[in-house]
Amino acid sequence: MTRADKAARLPATFMATKTIIKPKQSPAAVGPYNHAVRVGDLLFCAGQIPIDPKDGNLIAGDIKAQTGRVLQNVKAILDDQGLTFANVVKSTVFLTDLANFAGMNEIYAQYFTENFPARSTIQVAGLPKGAGVEIEVVAHF
């Protein structure tokens, strides 16, 4: 099979142009990455931590406050592209302590209210800037 034959069999998503998304309402990135990249009808959002977009600082507070700020940061990216949490098809939650799962889940359920995305939750040794939670999502246009 030639390369052209293989390309013809790929879904359009994999042949689409990569577009960098830089939402105006998002906090500055804390490293060499973009907050979101669109490829075809998919939007890949980088992991968001509880940074206040106004001052670039990690917010103070418990896991519920941190999760709320994280999801507000995710919402800013989705809003920028005309999407909502209903468009999210996959999320990955990173927690520094799985004992915080219930608190995170309580706030998460306020944003994802129906047609839930697939989700993974992973405990990690640490997150940037000392955050307790980070969430990344993939959304569909």
Regions found by a protein language model. Give the residues of each.
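Short, low-complexity intrinsically disordered segments enriched in A/P/G/S/L with frequent Arg
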Residues: A8-L10
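Short, polar/acidic, helix-capping and beta-turn segments at strand->helix junctions
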Residues: F14-F141
